[in-house]
Amino acid sequence: MSETHEKEIIEGTVEDIRFRNEQNGYTVLSVGCDDDLITAVGIFSDISVGETVKLQGEWTYHTTFGRQFKVEAFERNMPATTEQLYNYLAAGAIKGIGRATAERIVDMFGEKAFDYLESNPEMLSKVKGISPEKAEKICASYRSQFAIRSITMTLESYGIGPRECLAAYKAFGGDVVGKVTENPYVLCLPEVGVPFDRVETIADNLPHRPNDSYRIKAGIEHILRHNLYVDGHTCIPRDKLLRVAAEFLNTNADTVDIMTDELCHENRLVSKVFTDKEYVFLIQAFRDEKSISDRIKVLLNFPPAGHSALDSEIEKIEKADNISYAEKQKLAIKTAVNKGILILTGGPGTGKTTTLKGILRLFQSEGLDISLAAPTGRAAKRMTELTGKEAKTIHRLLEVEWDEHDRPTFKRNIRNPLECEALILDELSMVDISLFASLLNALPLGCRLIMLGDSDQLPPVGAGNVLHDLIESRLLPVVELKEVFRQSMGSLIVTNAHRIVNGEKIVTDRKDGDFFLMERQTPALAAKTIAELYAERLPRAYSYSPLRDIQVLCPSKKGEAGTVNLNKILQSLVNPPSDNKNELNSGFRLFREGDKVMQIKNNYDIHWDSDKESGEGIFNGDIGIIEKIDLKSETAFISFDDRTAQYAKEQMTELELAYAVTVHKSQGSEFKAVIMPVVNVIPQLCYRNLLYTAVTRAKELMIIVGTEDEVVKMAANDKKTRRYSALKKLLLNDAAPAILGTTGI
């Protein structure tokens, strides 16, 4: 059952400010309404005790604080009567004025009190108890407070929301109105974060049209940000940027060229010429890739002392574990120990885990302090299970915290490095440039760095192509495991994964196999079959839990066989509405107790508890199940493997149903059974690495529902999604010959 709320309007006087977060403006007020005292919560860019306000919002219930009025918009009414003036001044909003002084000011000046407070300290000093010096301070306090108020009122009249007003004031100070009036496009800067299209509207509503150069510069940065955060490009070829920006901004390429140079001189962009062509970066993207390049070279210059009896140590491990390493596996172990830095790559069944365990055993025998890390919670959990040693997410390892602009920073950094002597990092293909730069900066000099990944998978959701660029640079030791071991050769999942990588036709004709293709010619038929497999056939035949064991992976969100439509169908089948299941609407989504959900963006602020510990942070791609919805408090309790997190209603806008997810979102996870629609795949997603990534998510069973022709077409298309990045170029462009000459295996 669900609960809905209608918007209400409440008028009253602010009696008390019970809590205020100065960083984001979140405030808890006590508001007097007639004879009642209510609690109001929301974003207030500026508010004072004694003010008369009109609040628009809805009633909610908090488990700890009870009934609250959640404010979505508000208007303030300036005190008009002498009684309202007294209440406002007596509340202590202005420094130097208490109850007695407030009474004397109102008695002397009446309804014109604010006029004297604003500009006439000489008259104010005639009030008993106020010296000329005190009058100056009182007037200064009043002007300061009402300057902020005037600023926010002006900005809000331009169509800028309370949260954005606060961010703009924090970024630009008391001159913010002047800055915004002259150049509204400063609102596009990351520390404020107003989207470019909205700023265009704001600019149209200003009294005077701003200088067009401001617009063009902001448009150039907007294009680069979109390419960075949406498409993963860390840079764009300059000629392409000029062409795209000129068309987008309805100007000419020469003007864009001049503005790009100016942005570079202002240290907002970087333009760098490499051997092939010139590329343009946002300043932070360039710094991240340059930092990675520099730190890699530093680590290469601090190799560990060689191990004299390595062959005998490897033989001891083989005897103890009753195994026999292949030559490439031995090479990987020796390289990890002697070089101190290694990329270990290879597909399923090639022995990466066995090799990793050997490296770990040798590091432990040397008495090294070892840390294990992975980009996601699921990948870290799997790493822990495979090695028997705790692995942490990179964010947790680096001890994430917030800066003054609510952006994540890390306690562990170049000034406060990690205390480990060896770091083993899994799923490197998922790690973007920003996170990898932060991780490398936190490594102490001499720390060994072992990186595992599969370069045939999709690039990371974030910016860059770290694993690919590191391998292609040929600057680091790389061992690629290709031999499929006997125990994996019976698996068609493993066999077909390697056939896909080689562009060969998959094998699906074994009835007792673990890989099946079910021919369906249309998306509608594919969706119908997927629903039957998910809800009925696989649970009955394999005793699989639909929620915990089966995952539908789609190339895209759209279409009848996309995640949006399939999630609606699967939710109705495996978790239909019920009188004993609470529901909650958040944004445009309906969530129900028992739903499978996914976090779709990093949130470093959500609290979670487990049997062993508690912490903050649920990250992009984490999958959980809604265990309970409390309608009174409008909160949901969601289990993410061994952690339980509590979500407020507004935080649930960061969730999506996860019965079906995109292949991109599945990176770093494994599932007992995977079902994938492959029918009418759009050309932009008809790639080999997307199909390969989906297949390698399956541990026990892989079912493709679609057409063989479409599967063949995807497997044949080895053109990987184009990503502009400069890491490889930076690694090679200024690499010293001595370093290049010492990194071969």
Language-model segments: what does each one mean?
Residues M1-S312, I745:
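Accessory, non-ATPase domains that flank or precede helicase/AAA+ motor cores in DNA-metabolism machines
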Residues G50-T52, G594, G621:
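Loop/turn positions that initiate beta-strands
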Residues S312-G340:
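Conserved pre-motif I regulatory segment
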Residues K330-I333, N338-K511:
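ASCE P-loop NTPase helicase motor core
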Residues S455-E616, E627:
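Conserved helicase motor core of P-loop NTPases
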Residues N620-I745:
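C-terminal accessory regions
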